[in-house]
């Protein structure tokens, strides 16, 4: 679409070929090399369409660009997941422990894929968005079952509220109180989890 049919927002993207996107990303190659950075693929969840990224990932690998993916690991095609390992240097696993995001088979699928990646010795870190409905004891138990010793935590925010308002849609507030957030962080630390707090 050239523009939003509801007149709510303007176009913020345009299609690029793999070649065009590669050229665009390689403009910062010297910065990547100096900083130890690279290219990160994230949100929604790029693992859902990872095969479509293979041509781009292959070109970035040829250029020795460090590639990171942020994903829930909710992928039922383990063959595709295994194929992607050769292109991805770092995996950020976005843990979906919010009750509002519950899927009956999420734990099984994610745990299976996590085991696959660990067996291959890939670099994995874990991230969690904290919302008010989360119970610290329950989260700690789930982290223990997954063998998560270190966790990046982001406090839920309400940045999307204005977008919902423009669309005339109800906005559900998940932003936790400062007390519940600090209590959660304390519970993680007391359980021996190495916590890194993320800020926007």
Predicted regions span which residues?
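Iron-sulfur cluster-binding cysteine motifs and their immediate structural context
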Residues: 1-14
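A short acidic, glycine-rich active-site loop
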Residues: 99-105, 171-182
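A C-terminal junction/extension of Radical SAM enzymes
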Residues: 179-200
């Amino acid at each position: 679409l050239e523009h939003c049919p509801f007149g709510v927002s303007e176009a913020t993207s345009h299609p690029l070929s793999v070649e065009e996107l590669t050229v665009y990303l390689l403009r910062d190659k010297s910065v990547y090399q100096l900083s130890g950075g690279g290219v990160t693929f994230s949100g929604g969840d790029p693992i859902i369409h990872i095969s479509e990224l293979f041509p781009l990932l292959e070109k970035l690998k040829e250029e020795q660009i460090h590639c990171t993916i942020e994903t829930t690991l909710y992928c039922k095609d383990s063959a595709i997941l295994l194929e992607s390992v050769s292109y991805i240097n770092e995996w950020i696993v976005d843990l979906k422990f919010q009750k509002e995001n519950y899927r009956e088979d999420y734990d099984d699928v994610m745990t299976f894929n996590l085991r696959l990646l660990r067996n291959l010795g890939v670099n994995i870190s874990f991230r969690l968005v904290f919302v008010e409905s989360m119970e610290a004891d329950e989260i700690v138990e789930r982290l223990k079952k997954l063998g998560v010793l270190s966790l990046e935590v982001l406090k839920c925010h309400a940045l999307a509220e204005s977008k919902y308002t423009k669309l005339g849609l109800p906005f559900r507030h998940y932003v936790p109180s400062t007390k519940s957030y600090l209590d959660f962080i304390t519970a993680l630390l007391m359980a021996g989890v190495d916590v890194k707090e993320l800020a926007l």
